[in-house]
């Protein structure tokens, strides 16, 4: 028979497992459209600094894609950032799903517009020297055809590598 502390620990463990299961289901149900591979050379390998960097990147990306009115309504890019090789070669794999917006509807090619915005942001925020790392931009920005395979690749080092401070799975509008 379990004592009070044992029952409480068991209850907390069940709660965490249930939340993790719901999170995994939400991630797998999302139809991810793009992946950004973002190497962070010459960056301090402190996790909170890297998370703040990704937060700035996502805020700027949302401002480039959505109007102020859409942002006030809660429209934003859905993202799943995962940090890999935190201490040796820090880099993020970010899955994106971009809901329709006024600016996107006025562009003839949504993918080309988003790719240009992402590459401009990487350059303007001095995240990495793109012409050295990926001169053709084929590794930095990728269109996804297999969303579940991309999630599997992103989570290959485990769920603890997810940057939960910057995860956005649904719009709040």
Predicted regions and their residues:
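A short, contiguous, amphipathic alpha-helix enriched in charged residues
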Residues: 52-74
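Histidine-centered divalent-metal-coordination microenvironment in nucleic-acid enzymes
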Residues: 78-102
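Catalytic "initiation/cleavage/transfer" segments centered on a nucleophilic residue
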Residues: 1-34, 42-54, 100-173
């Amino acid at each position: 028979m379990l004592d009070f502390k044992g029952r409480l620990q068991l209850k907390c463990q069940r709660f965490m497992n249930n939340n993790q299961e719901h999170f995994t289901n939400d991630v797998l149900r999302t139809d991810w459209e793009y992946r950004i591979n973002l190497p962070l050379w010459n960056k301090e390998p402190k996790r909170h600094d890297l998370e703040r960097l990704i937060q700035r990147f996502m805020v700027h990306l949302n401002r480039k894609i959505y109007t102020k009115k859409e942002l006030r309504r809660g429209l934003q890019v859905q993202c799943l950032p995962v940090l890999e090789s935190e201490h040796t070669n820090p880099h993020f794999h970010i899955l994106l799903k971009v809901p329709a917006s006024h600016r996107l509807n006025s562009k003839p090619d949504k993918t080309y517009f988003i790719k240009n915005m992402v590459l401009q942001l990487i350059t303007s925020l001095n995240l990495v020297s793109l012409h050295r790392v990926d001169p053709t931009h084929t590794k930095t920005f990728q269109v996804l055809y297999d969303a579940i395979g991309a999630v599997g690749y992103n989570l290959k080092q485990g769920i603890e590598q997810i940057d939960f401070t910057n995860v956005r799975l649904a719009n709040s509008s």
